[in-house]
């Protein structure tokens, strides 16, 4: 058996040579380690895919690995051409949320691929599981022993990060060594009983187990007068862009050091920051607890989630093109609330949001935050904002909770509430799912016609099925001449942040086929196991009525099969649907894919070698009207 070397200069060199795209630093190192093993003539390379993970105190439906953990092994193997080189990838899919049986099945299958009998595989698995538990218990016991022995004025630093950052000599930037050389007492997150803390009442939708552990660790550190955090995050990590805000919230006025791991980091800069932090701690007086400390006795505050059916305050909803008016009508008619549509996200709002950012947050988050803050400045009295959640595993499902935390930080929590319906649960929990779906279809129909005729198809109220069918038949009669461009991406990138791009294209006379939001949600709900047969029947009927103007897939099964081919079981930002739409699109001149800059799912799609039957141009929006971006788009259009 071969192990790759501890990360060294050669690993970094290989990573820089083979890694593609703006992936996070740890994923870049996977390229280096797997290429090293390939150069050593390995027959097999073991790199599992982490789909879900177990976390005992979690309250979410599924505890997901990030989008890279779900896909990295397969994507890196493809880019390194391992199969062509005669090297087999062993990449069992770990679905630890489904219990020990699922884990055992995945590992036994891997063992049998290597020629071992199932009983021998099970024995090895049990031995390994026992060793992990023994290690976990011993680490927490060591931590307790240290904390019990501390003098009242002693300070202990706790390294907070993911396990792979903790142990890797490059990813941890030698910080443990630097701290120990300076005489610090140092432990890490594994020495604290973070797994026994239930934070789900305060953070109900943190679906990353490492994120849950980091936040429970933050509570333990905040609660113990002798503990101070050194928090390492990863450049390019979507989850870290959200967790950093919540970690800061937990620390409050207690000093801590946060350093972002980046391939361009300066060792001198790291040392300077460490020494400045240690110097500040010398002047920070440790407050004696006065008695024995129960470190687990942490404060977990109830997160007050507002509800449409019980909270009577006026409601604001984010701008999402024509879909916003349909959503507003739905809320008014079903819940009797006063509803206002927020303005389209502007450059000014993005800049306002950036006054509270800490790293490279997606512009969909930054713009939405700025939009909420500006609304709070102009709206009088109390109001609620609808910011949907999803079940994971991209950063977007946590936007609502983080924006709520930042509203609290700004002192606006008494005026501004957040309503965050779970998107996957809408078929079960919406007051009238079919009506909501018909509202999406109404906007889909309006977007199926050219801009100069669109006003004829905009509805004031949500039509019923029969009215939708007649509307679609009318739309089918409109004929347009010119090249057709398929518009794909994330809904907010297309319908709010990317409107200047769409105007640019329509000004040039291109026919745009917009990604239909009804199909987007129907696919998401199908993936989550919801019963959507009736909704599909209505959508199919509208698609047929639209004829050649239909933006819908002719056969939904084609989309599902395309998604399963490369991203079976994948969870994150409806990435399966977005991938399938692009890779099956044939009835247009080109695809324009609009996504937020730095979005991890977009990078995963690119790394997958996503092929499109027609030319594709990718645009990463970042909240401004970028002339070079439009120039690049113009050049692309010239050749189609």
Q: Can you annotate each of these PLM segments?
A:
Residues 1-640:
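An N-terminal assembly and electron-transfer interface module characteristic of large anaerobic redox
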